[in-house]
């Protein structure tokens, strides 16, 4: 399927749910309290402008994880209201129709999403802390304090630096000058992701050389080489150094929540991605892990990220990529052009050779597609990857196509509505309503599918428009009648790069992830 950065984010949110160690039962929603501000599209901007630091939860009333968060968020808000100065927590029902513009503006891809608004909205960052009251309180107290803390002694370092987390320290001869200013700027930008400190003495730190030429940035981490240094204080270079150094050479995809931040970075990266999936509990795991780690070391100078995933924890990824458990052990490469390369039933001693073939351009991409249906006489036509271009772009017709997932509740609700609309338009030979299972078929690059259901309207001339109107049969029929072009049966073509996409996604969140 077409995989763009926002589509990856949708996958990441699904992975975050899969990695949650909390129980899945639905708790009762928290009683409405006064500590959390309730905002809507009319009051939002005024509230942001009023508060130098404000935290906002974007939620949906039907979202189970939002219900689970509600009492914790309320209790945290009560505790933080006593902080000096008070830390304000707010919430927005992003599922309410009038508030949809806020969800679009702030790129809300799933529920709940929490964002930190600093400097009266001039600086907006993702909340990446705990989801229970005490953890929320501790995390936000850190966020409202200085972006980097001074380390004056080894005892300070012991108190601030967690051996299981990444910690970034600037080592200076004095706390002034361009290097210090740039370091503090980067610390402010990345403070929701990492903890920062600054010191005059490298020997206060638990790892790394004590005798250093200052200034220097030292990054301490719980994986690979444990400590890396850089002397480049250019802001862009420092950001790049941190980005490259804060992901393991091989990311592990299992149920350990400590690995979740590395998974987020892995899937957010624009670099090609190699993913090895197998059963972690079986005997060959150790030999595969050793061989895969050696391959990652051998190709560390190539622009590619490596992940090893446990079958049990990777069901969301299997569903997303259309993989099957009986194909494991398997290795999948997703490159920057959305091409995929797959080797199923791979042996540990085949990994390096297969990766060399990839880098040498000798592998053939593969495409997920269900079989083309032999019978396709229902009102809503079934389209698969192997015939989508012929059906949508070369038919000379106006095609409304839905990209759906079989498990998606909103898709199930929409199905009879599309059937009704298709039946109403059945006598119009210039119009077709179709659907594609986006979990079993690769979506063409002409369509940006970020969630389910996603609908697009394609005209005979190749104009591609996202459908963001109402979800009744009458709404759909009216839209098609107003938007359709006169069919051109003798002018069939594939628009390719010249296809025009119009419209914006008014409903970025399509289902609870």
Swiss-Prot record:
Q: Which GO terms describe its molecular function?
A: protein disulfide isomerase activity
Thioredoxin domain spans which residues? 24-145, 366-485
Which Pfam families does this chain map to? Thioredoxin, Thioredoxin_6
| Cellular compartment(s) | Endoplasmic reticulum lumen
Entry keywords, A to Z: Disulfide bond, Endoplasmic reticulum, Glycoprotein, Isomerase, Redox-active center, Repeat, Signal
**Superkingdom of the source?**
Eukaryota
Q: Name one GO cellular component term.
A: endoplasmic reticulum lumen
Q: Where is this site: Lowers pKa of C-terminal Cys of first active site?
A: 131
Return the annotated site residues (Contributes to redox potential value).
64-65, 409-410
Tell me which positions the record assigns to the signal sequence: 1-23
Regions of biased composition (Basic and acidic residues) lie at 502-513
Q: Which residues are glycosylated?
A: 279
Q: Where is this motif: Prevents secretion from ER?
A: 510-513
State where it is primarily located. endoplasmic reticulum
Q: Which GO terms describe its biological process?
A: protein folding; response to endoplasmic reticulum stress
EC class name: isomerase
InterPro entries annotated for this entry? PDI_thioredoxin-like_dom, Prot_disulphide_isomerase, Thioredoxin-like_sf, Thioredoxin_CS, Thioredoxin_domain
Q: Which Cys pairs are S-S linked?
A: 63-66, 408-411
The family note in this entry says: Belongs to the protein disulfide isomerase family.
Protein name, as recorded: Protein disulfide-isomerase
Q: Which classification does the entry list for the species?
A: Eukaryota, Viridiplantae, Streptophyta, Embryophyta, Tracheophyta
